[in-house]
Swiss-Prot record:
Cellular compartment(s): Cytoplasm
EC numbers: 2.5.1.6
The organism of origin for this protein: Gluconobacter oxydans (strain 621H) (Gluconobacter suboxydans)
Designated name of the protein: S-adenosylmethionine synthase
Taxonomic lineage of the native organism: Bacteria, Pseudomonadati, Pseudomonadota, Alphaproteobacteria, Acetobacterales
GO terms for cellular component: cytoplasm
Cofactor remark from the record: Binds 2 divalent ions per subunit.
Pathway: Amino-acid biosynthesis; S-adenosyl-L-methionine biosynthesis; S-adenosyl-L-methionine from L-methionine: step 1/1
Job of this protein: Catalyzes the formation of S-adenosylmethionine (AdoMet) from methionine and ATP. The overall synthetic reaction is composed of two sequential steps, AdoMet formation and the subsequent tripolyphosphate hydrolysis which occurs prior to release of AdoMet from the enzyme.
GO BP terms, alphabetized: one-carbon metabolic process; S-adenosylmethionine biosynthetic process
Needed co-factor(s): Mg(2+); K(+)
Binding-site residues for ATP, renumbered to this chain: 18, 169-171, 243, 249-250, 266, 270
Keywords for the protein's UniProt record, in alphabetical order: ATP-binding, Cytoplasm, Magnesium, Metal-binding, Nucleotide-binding, One-carbon metabolism, Potassium, Transferase
GO MF term set: ATP binding; magnesium ion binding; methionine adenosyltransferase activity
Amino acid sequence: MRNHGDFLFTSESVSEGHPDKVADRISDTVLDAYLQADPEARVACETLVTTNRVILAGEVRGPKEVEDTLIDRAREAIKDIGYDQEGFSWKKADITSYLHAQSADIAQGVDSGSDKDEGAGDQGIMFGYATRETEHLMPAPLYYAQTILERIRDYRKNGDARGVGLLPDAKSQVTLRYVDGKPVGVTSVVISTQHVEGMSQNTIRETLRDVVNGILPEGWTCPEDEFYVNPTGNFVIGGPDGDAGLTGRKIIVDTYGGAAPHGGGAFSGKDPTKVDRSAAYAARYLAKNVVAAGLADRCTIQLSYAIGVSKPLSVYVDLDGTGKDVDEARLGAILNEVVDLSPRGIRKHLRLNRPIYVPTSAYGHFGRAPDPVLDNFTWEQTDLVTTLRGALNR
């Protein structure tokens, strides 16, 4: 995203009932089941969902007894999302598991022994980003797109009269106007939400207009002719009955809405030895702490890894010209020094070997507030602020 000058920028989001997000939810349900039984379990679970059909595939290493519970757990996940429709129902869906043992060739490069550090589970590049555009240090278009769908979910699941008739599948898209690189207003909003047969589109529009007005900053009003609700008309057939869904297909929604680079790796269904997930969380953690410390208004972090190698091959910092008298190369070295960026170091620092991943499967992995019971989203903490300021002043 160009962060200077005047421009329009758009981000989209999808709800927990979107087919790809249903797949993500089930994959993370499998992951949490294994981590609950064994914090050192290995999981790489892919899910396919379509009309009353769910297929699990991938590799695992963990307690055998967990396997026998997975179909019931997947069914409960579908129930919690809200699907009990003719074409996709938690009661009737045919759920099949093809999960099998993790490759020994991968395990020998990843497992730690007495004479070596634990290596990364694969090669790859991961990015983290933070910006002062919102209080959560997230890009504003994505933040508002996510929040709109979370509000609709709350109406639907919490018994609010405004949610009556709304169904789980939904999408949003928000376009903001930037002046001198800063968001100053909204130019368009698109929302498509599944609903019961016969529900008035005018009623849906009025409800969603109230949602949007309650979320956007004061003075930001979307023009009526640029406020699009179910633009194609009825949206009754949705979810996996309307479109097949796959794990890992919404990686931009999961991260920064296109405002920052993406290394290409998905998150859901992967245990934290997979640096696609854990290193992306670490990169966000570092970038957020840099911005929270007042060292820059924007920060992009890139980390890179090789399979079987414990330390990152590179740590790259880009402050996009917003640094406060900070040398980016020196800052990168400091970040690599104050946090152990090996796979095990990341997991230990952020306490990732726990069943904390189901809540990440929808509405974004970043910019989220932790659940006090789960103690999750640890990568959103800003506990490095004092350390970074002190290190730069040495």
